[in-house]
Design a protein with these regions (language model features):
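P-loop NTPase catalytic phosphate-binding loop
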Residues: 220
Length: 399
């Protein structure tokens, strides 16, 4: 095993020891809303319950600064962030001030923890790629395995969480796959796209990619209908006809909303600026989580209606309520941005700035925040600031 993986394990062991010695047994898990986030939450929930912790979960689409502030104003608590949080480790440290034990199990871009009570358990810090070699669920799985070897029976969730990473399973994800195969939780099969993995412990054997899609639908489209909780239940107890019917209903709901949005854009076109093309969905996706606008933008970026050299931006209204948490103090809109293929190549050649640089900056200018990758990013801005945001992004995109 590579030394960087061993270094990462050693740091995890310290966090596990701290958790075991902590006097409090109530834990709040804050997790992301996609399949990786649901799998991560399910792993740590089950692992902690086996150690007699009481566990609550909150599913977040974005980690709002005001949520960090409210949670970490408390004292003597245990907070575990899964598949979310690393980008905000510095902010979490500032607000936590060693008052609570905080573990961040994530694989996204990170800021560094400045608080010894905030453990930023991210493979990226140790030179392991979170984009290619380690999903959030894999990070969480190895944490659970160090906590108790019994948790190796959760290795299949690491594989489902890894489905979002393109290409063959590699790196730390492959180490988890070895465990899953050894335990008979996963079966290898061939598909026309190459190697496939069938998950054999959730009822009927299904491809890990199909289960990943189903969980993401529950977490995003079903965000306001108890979808994330239902998704965690699927992760641990398997599929049944009732949940499959519910997933089918959500997929149809999204398909109708996507179709309606596409027809409107084909009829009216996108609003064109010098470097940005954009649309506002308003309440087209009402009742669904905001991840749906990102999925729609990804699809739209491949359509002929899109200018291949301009950043593509979609905006939708957001509900101020977060299930299991309460209401945000401000009204925001969700921003999703994608780059068409040609623009993506230009960014790769450093002829155009990456979204990961310009989108957060434009969001911050308009009362919000953002994060993401070079060709796909998202954020929020204050409601009413949409036009100013796209104008700011347009200027930044021309630099």
């Amino acid at each position: 095993m590579e030394s960087k993986i061993l270094d990462f394990y050693e740091y995890m062991k310290k966090a596990v020891e701290k958790l075991k010695s902590y006097r409090i047994k109530e834990t709040l898990i804050i997790h992301h809303d996609d399949a990786d986030g649901l799998c991560s939450s399910a792993i740590v929930k089950k692992a902690l319950e086996r150690e007699n912790f009481t566990v609550k979960t909150i599913c977040l689409e974005k980690l709002f600064p005001e949520i960090i502030e409210k949670l970490h104003s408390d004292e003597g608590k245990i907070f575990i962030y899964t598949d979310i949080g690393s980008a905000h480790a510095e902010k979490i440290s500032e607000k936590n001030k060693s008052k609570n034990l905080t573990l961040i199990l994530d694989h996204h871009d990170f800021t560094r923890s400045k608080d010894p009570m905030v453990y930023n358990l991210n493979p990226e810090i140790f030179g392991i790629s979170g984009e290619k070699e380690a999903s959030g669920a894999t990070v969480t799985y190895f944490f659970a395995k160090i906590l108790n070897k019994q948790n190796m029976d959760l290795a299949y969730l690491s594989i489902i969480g890894s489905a979002e990473i393109p290409g063959p399973i590699s790196g730390l994800n492959k180490e988890a796959l070895k465990d899953a195969l050894e335990k008979g939780l996963v079966e290898t099969s061939k598909s026309r796209f190459g190697e496939d993995y069938k998950i054999s412990v959730l009822g009927k054997p299904l491809s890990y990619k199909r289960i990943s899609t189903m969980l993401s639908v529950l977490g995003s489209v079903g965000y306001y209908e108890g979808g994330p909780e239902k998704g965690i239940k699927v992760c641990l107890e398997g599929l049944n006809p009732t949940i499959e019917k519910f997933i089918g209903k959500l997929e149809e709901k999204r398909r109708i909303a996507n179709q309606k949005m596409l027809e409107k854009i084909r009829k009216e076109g996108l609003i064109q600026l010098k470097n940005v093309q954009w649309f506002h969905a308003y309440d087209n996706f009402s009742g669904m989580g905001t991840k749906v606008i990102g999925s729609f933008c990804s699809y739209l970026s491949f359509q002929k209606i899109v200018n291949p050299k301009k950043y593509l931006v979609g905006i939708m209204n957001m509900q101020p309520t977060i299930p299991g948490y309460g209401s945000l103090t401000k009204n925001y809109v969700k921003i999703s941005a994608r780059t068409p293929k040609l623009l993506g190549q230009m960014i790769g050649e450093e002829k155009k700035p990456p979204l990961s640089k310009i989108l957060p900056e434009a969001c911050e200018k308009n009362g919000g925040f953002g994060d993401g990758h070079s060709v796909a990013a998202s954020g929020v801005v204050l409601k009413g600031k949409e036009k100013k945001f796209v104008e700011d992004l347009d200027v930044l995109g021309g630099k």
